[in-house]
Amino acid sequence: MHKLVSQLVIYRNLPADNLLEPLAEICAEFSAGDYNREDLTAEIYEQVHKLLDIGTVYGFDKNLWHNYLAFLLVSCENPFAITCEKVGACDGSVNQFAKHDFKIFQQLFTYDFSELERALEINCFSLISNYQAVVKQERRYNKNISEKVQALSTALEGAADADEFFACVTKFYHDYGVGKLGLNKAFRIAQAQQGEPELVPISNTEQIIFADLIGYEDQKKRLLENTEAFVAGRSANNVLLFGDSGTGKSSSIKALINKYYDQGLRMIEIYKHQFRDLSQVIAQIKNRNYRFIIYMDDLSFEEFEIEYKYLKAIIEGGLEVRPDNILIYATSNRRHLINETWKDRNDVTQEDGIYKSDTMQEKLSLVNRFGCTIYYGQPTQKEYYKIVCELAKKQGLELDDDFLCAEARKWELHHGGISGRTAQQFINYLQGVADFSKK
């Protein structure tokens, strides 16, 4: 195995925490015959332990060795893989180097650990090659990655030669991409040890779809039209969804990533205190073959906050052209985002040499940077009842509409007033009562 791994070209720089290189070193020690049996066995168990951990995180099953090799191929963000993401393989000499590496991976797929197991009297490699995973709830592992990697693993098992192996891997790169950006829908921003912002995958995103959002058809239509244009590579605008709380603004944004993920849409959630990191985040993603929505939930600024200046600078752009694969989508309960005071409206007085009306204009100009503004208003009483009845049907609650509406009326009087959120909370309550009564 060590000889095989040492001959890799394109996939030579594997992730620092990979298991392939340590296992190759173990096999080299064994082949040389210069090893301590107990120490070598302990090293093997350490790598198998790591493999089991990875299998648990991603819900791998059956042949964990094959699953891991497939996972390694879709995780390596080398230049070849990145050029293939969302477009597939292009003609070029690099393909010959890729096929050279894939021939090696094909040999790794069929690598025989039996001699090692017999000599050390272990059976861990046999077990991981015919593994039966414990059935887990979806929230316990990343189902999105699990299904895709296991499907690729199965396809690679059936590849007859390096050409078929090449076709399987590059098709995966075309369909989904490579690395964490290819395998995950959404990300948050964290600070890496070096102080630079790092994109961290959100493994369990809310599985909401537009059919779950009752009402607001015009709003959803405008949002979808803008997003479809963006995903298709046409001109599109930054979007601001504003209006009353609990009306489905955030849910509408979340539904977008579930609808357009397979078409290359990715979402990055960012908070106000991270706005100063926006330039560095954009630098990390601007040359990737995906469409990115930078998502800001419940966006608003108080009079003393200046983070909006970072946001304006990013939206307006400086000397560098704003990347066409990035848009900003925000939700807010405020139409103008920034708290406006009567003091800002005073056109006569000056403060530190600046007219206060200029201050007001600077604050209010931020909303104008969003080319698409969509209002989500509080539903009427009739619309509220419709939402309640539709949600009840979706949950399988067989209750009379008149009864539902009467109870929904009582509920909203004590739980924040009329809104889609209030309706959902009411249905959750009824569902909980119904489930309890069945016990």
What are these regions (language model features)?
Residues V200-E228:
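N-terminal pre-Walker A segment at the start of P-loop NTPase domains
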Residues E302-D352:
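Conserved catalytic/switch belt of AAA+ P-loop NTPases
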Residues M1-E157:
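Intrinsically disordered, low-complexity N-terminal extensions of AAA+/P-loop NTPases
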Residues A133-L199:
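Interdomain "pre-motor" coupling segment immediately N-terminal to P-loop NTPase/helicase cores
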Residues T373, G377-K439:
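C-terminal alpha-helical "lid" subdomain
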Residues R234-I253:
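Walker A/P-loop nucleotide-binding motif
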Residues T349-L364, G371-Y385:
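Conserved AAA+ ATPase "SRH/arginine-finger" region at the nucleotide-binding site
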Residues N258-F292, L299-F304:
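AAA+/P-loop NTPase substrate/partner-engagement loops
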